[in-house]
A protein has these predicted regions:
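N-terminal nucleotide-binding beta1-loop-alpha1 segment
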Residues: 1-17
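Conserved N-terminal catalytic core of the sugar/cofactor nucleotidyltransferase
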Residues: 2-6, 28-93
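Cofactor-binding loop segments of dinucleotide-utilizing enzymes, especially the Rossmann-like FAD-
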Residues: 7-10, 51, 98, 122
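Short glycine-enriched, charge-decorated loop/helix-capping segments at active-site entrances
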Residues: 18-24, 177
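Conserved beta-loop-beta/alpha segment of the NTase-like Rossmann-fold superfamily
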Residues: 59-136
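Conserved core of the sugar-phosphate nucleotidyltransferase
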Residues: 103-179
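Catalytic core and acceptor-binding pocket of nucleotide-sugar-dependent glycosyltransferases
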Residues: 179-192
């Protein structure tokens, strides 16, 4: 697996600058750090889906980084952005939410998974944008942003997921039949 997709299109409610571009250590921003980690792990194809303030992301374009513009970022959610890369995905890949801070070890572990899907999760953060996880026998049975729908709370998604191509293609098929532009990719993960 040598491909990663980073979703960065949305406009944050409380910031004029996209979260992935805010400095995290005085000089680097989150996208700088994420790209560095992916390169250290020999990812050769990185697709950055941009929308709000898309021109601010142009500096990241490189031979190994392709920018895809979601012109409808204001009226679509994460699945709308993810669907834009359907013609560029030819195998399994890492899906990363651009405003997510994570350890290199997480990428190493997900990259080492030989096949299938793998969702990373942690304890509840209280960020207000959680996607809660319920599992049964080691398998995810429910993903929801509504905590009231979870009987056996396991945690929340981190925002870094290994997706197999078969699942991704099923998600795309469901998206193309959907009438809801605000659909988040997390919901389709358990629907397919």
């Amino acid at each position: 697996m040598n491909t990663a997709v980073i979703l960065t299109a949305r406009k944050e409610r409380d910031s004029q600058i996209p979260y992935p571009l805010l400095p995290i250590d005085g000089k680097r921003c989150l996208i700088d750090r994420t790209l560095q980690l992916l390169r250290e792990l020999h990812y050769e194809r990185i697709i950055l889906v941009v929308g709000y303030c898309h021109e601010m992301f142009q500096r990241f374009a490189a031979p190994d980084v392709t920018l895809v513009y979601n012109a409808e970022y204001e009226i679509t959610a994460s699945m709308g952005s993810l669907a834009l890369v359907k013609d560029q995905i030819d195998g399994d890949f890492l899906l990363i939410e651009g405003d997510t801070f994570f350890e290199k070890q997480l990428l190493e572990r997900l990259s080492a998974v030989p096949h299938g899907n793998c969702i990373s999760y942690t304890e509840e953060s209280g960020s207000g944008d959680e996607c809660y996880i319920e599992t049964r026998n080691g398998f995810v049975t429910k993903l929801t942003k509504d905590r009231h729908r979870v009987c056996r709370f396991e945690g929340e998604m981190i925002g870094v997921t290994r997706l197999c191509q078969t699942t991704f293609l099923r998600m795309i098929q469901e998206w193309e039949r959907s009438s809801n532009p605000y659909l988040n990719y997390e919901y389709l993960l358990t629907d397919v």
